[in-house]
From Swiss-Prot:
Additional free-text comment from the UniProt record: In eukaryotes there are two forms of the enzymes: a cytosolic one and a mitochondrial one.
Protein name, UniProt field: Serine hydroxymethyltransferase, cytosolic
Primary site of residence: cytoplasm
Cofactor(s) the record lists: pyridoxal 5'-phosphate
Pathway annotation: One-carbon metabolism; tetrahydrofolate interconversion
Keywords linked to the UniProt accession: Acetylation, Cytoplasm, One-carbon metabolism, Pyridoxal phosphate, Transferase
Gene name of the record: SHMT1
Domain of life: Eukaryota
Catalyzed reactions per annotation: (6R)-5,10-methylene-5,6,7,8-tetrahydrofolate + glycine + H2O = (6S)-5,6,7,8-tetrahydrofolate + L-serine
Source organism of the structure: Bos taurus (Bovine)
Length: 484
């Protein structure tokens, strides 16, 4: 028997405890973390989840995510790894790529996909790194108008997103009166700005994008067109909203929103023949594959998260089923039912409705704002988020609430259920107005929260609504792992 390296005999009891630690279930090994997870599980079970970017992953996805694939390091790409022992990791990644192309009906001769991005933000930054030189120019929908931080957000005084720090960003806007994207203004600004990349993507925009118009603007300016379909990727897979693939050079996405997978990202890119010279017949081919793959690894990331790639692969298989397509149709139907119910209760919904999974409710006509309403609704077990509305003067006091239907649709809610949800929201906003009247319209959010927490009459009203909400929510099963 070889002597221990440290010259001391191994403590058999200590080593036995080590082996026990490795085999213990979470509830025995770390009761603090276990209890936090249980509390969060209960919050999800008894509450109404209306955050548009959230969903409930299936048991199969979560099982893949918690598998032994977490243990394996595999820098590089299939067949070109920097580590040994990657035979099955290669098999998994190739399967995930194949399913990603299949779910969107893409020809592998014309499209490729990178499934290694850790999430949507790194995926977007990898595209910019690949296609836009440092300090090159990009155009994305402004964050206050429904865009995303990673599309180049900055204020008059500060560059907020890393995208705006390392690249020159000019946002495009919506029409403040209609809430629709102002494509004419975008076209004029692009002619003056000469972007290298135009981003067709949103985080709070309830209408379909005009990809054909965006592609024409890109072509007129020699720019690439990239779609960030993170919010609508599941809807695109089911064919219930227009696909960006017909018009875009590159498409990025997360995998955990409407696609209902785990948290990860994907980048699709065109390949093959880009154009043919009509005089000589000479072909020009896309070179996006090497640029994007190099930007992901080794440019911005190290080893891929193989457990997440497994979860994505499972979600992609589920997304090719008839039941998934039925689910996505119901997401849109539920969103329209929610919009109609709220408008019937006197609320203004930006753009007057929705083509997808979310709506933006403008509370200015009610005399309050999204921050206050969000806090009261949260106290009533309704989760949503404050959001700027077109024409808002300050992002610090946004006027709107963003509401989405994917998560609750996964729990089985239908149109009539969302009508009831709308009435819960209405009662929560009425409570918001009562508290605001008591504390004063000019009070800070902190003062508003102190009033919410300190006044007995408000406590009773919130508790009564919360009890009704939780009684209603628990009628619907929560997907996921048993025991959590």
């Amino acid at each position: 028997m070889a002597a221990p390296v440290n010259k001391a005999p191994r403590d058999a009891n200590l080593w036995s405890l080590h082996e026990k630690m490795l085999a213990q279930p979470l509830k025995d090994n770390d009761v603090e973390v276990y209890n936090i997870i249980k509390k969060e599980s209960n919050r999800q079970r008894v509450g109404l989840e209306l955050i548009a970017s959230e969903n409930f992953a299936s048991r199969a996805v979560l099982e893949a995510l918690g598998s032994c694939l977490n243990n394996k390091y595999s820098e590089g790409y299939p067949g070109q790894r920097y580590y040994g022992g990657t035979e099955f990791i290669d098999e998994l990644e190739v399967l995930c790529q194949k399913r990603a192309l299949q779910v969107y009906g893409l020809d592998s001769q014309c499209w490729g996909v990178n499934v290694q991005p850790y999430s949507g933000s790194p995926a977007n930054f990898a595209v910019y790194t690949a296609l836009v030189e440092p300090h090159g120019r990009i155009m994305g929908l402004d964050l206050p108008d429904g865009g995303h931080l990673t599309h180049g957000f900055m204020t008059d005084k500060k560059k907020i997103s890393a995208t705006s720090i390392f690249f020159e960003s000019m946002p495009y806007k919506v029409n403040p009166d209609t809430g629709y994207i102002n494509y004419d203004q975008l076209e004029e600004n692009a002619r003056l700005f000469h972007p290298r990349l135009i981003i067709a993507g949103t985080s709070c925009y309830s209408r379909n994008l005009d990809y054909a118009r965006l592609r024409k603007i890109a072509d007129d300016n020699g720019a690439y067109l990239m779609a960030d379909m993170a919010h609508v990727s599941g809807l695109v897979a089911a064919g219930v909203v227009p696909s960006p693939f017909e018009h875009c050079h590159v498409v990025s996405t997360t995998t955990h929103k409407t696609l209902r997978g785990c948290r990860a990202g994907m980048i699709f890119y065109r390949k093959g023949v880009r154009s043919v010279d009509p005089k000589t017949g000479r072909e020009t081919r896309y070179n996006l594959e090497s640029l994007i793959n190099s930007a992901v690894f080794p440019g911005l990331q190290g080893g891929p998260h193989n457990h997440a790639i497994a979860g994505v692969a499972v979600a992609l298989k589920q997304a090719m089923t008839p039941e998934f397509r039925a689910y996505q149709r119901q997401v849109v139907a539920n969103c329209r039912a929610l919009a109609e119910a709220l408008m019937g209760l006197g609320y203004r919904v930006v753009t007057g409705g929705s083509d997808n999974h979310l709506i933006l409710v403008d509370l200015r006509s009610k005399g309050t704002d999204g921050g206050r309403a969000e806090k009261v609704l949260e106290a009533c077990s309704i989760a949503c988020n404050k959001n700027t509305c077109p024409g808002d003067k300050s992002a610090l006091r946004p006027s709107g609430l963003r509401l989405g239907t994917p998560a609750l649709t996964s729990r089985g809610l239908l149109e009539e259920d969302f009508q009831k949800v709308a009435h819960f929201i209405h009662r929560g906003i009425e409570l918001t107005l009562q508290i605001q009247d008591a504390v004063g319209v000019k009070a800070t959010l902190k003062e508003f929260m102190e009033k919410l927490a300190g006044a007995e009459e408000h406590h009773r009203a919130v508790a009564a609504l919360r009890a009704e909400v939780e009684s209603f929510a628990t009628l619907f099963p929560l997907p996921g792992l048993p025991g959590f």
